[in-house]
Amino acid sequence: METITLSFGFSNLQKALDIFLNDFISTYKSLLIRDNKKASGNLINSIKSLGIVYINNKIQASIELASYWKYVEYGRKPGKFPPPDKILNWVNVKPIIPRPLNGIKPTTKQLAFLISRKIARDGIKAGNQFSEALDLVWSRQKDNIENAVSLDLESEISVIKIK
């Protein structure tokens, strides 16, 4: 009994996926800006490509981004108060200028509390910019990826020889 192992190089696919990943990051950033999700710019500035890797017979494209991206994407259900320090930082960065009510102007800490209370009571609406970016980029890049796979397979199949 003899075993034949076929190995395939996917250089065209690697290039196509790199283009896909860079297009995704650019599109995601522009959608966040479009939807006014740039308070401090921390989320947008945190988005970086970690590249394409092959792990356990799968191709994985990885990006790095601020951990709170999921609240921007999926929103937040009503219930608990968000972390007060995060809301206070957001109030300071945005900047939100409190309006006086009955002649009393709230401090930034009081304003952060009021915002936190509203989030706890009503939640935060989902933004869906991540999902929208994936859909847009896939529709633009799908043909490129399919062509890259075809080119890679054609070139590899033509060099396979059994002796």
Report the location of each language-model feature.
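Charge-rich, low-complexity N-terminal segments
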Residues: 1-52
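Charged, low-complexity interaction tracts
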Residues: 42-163
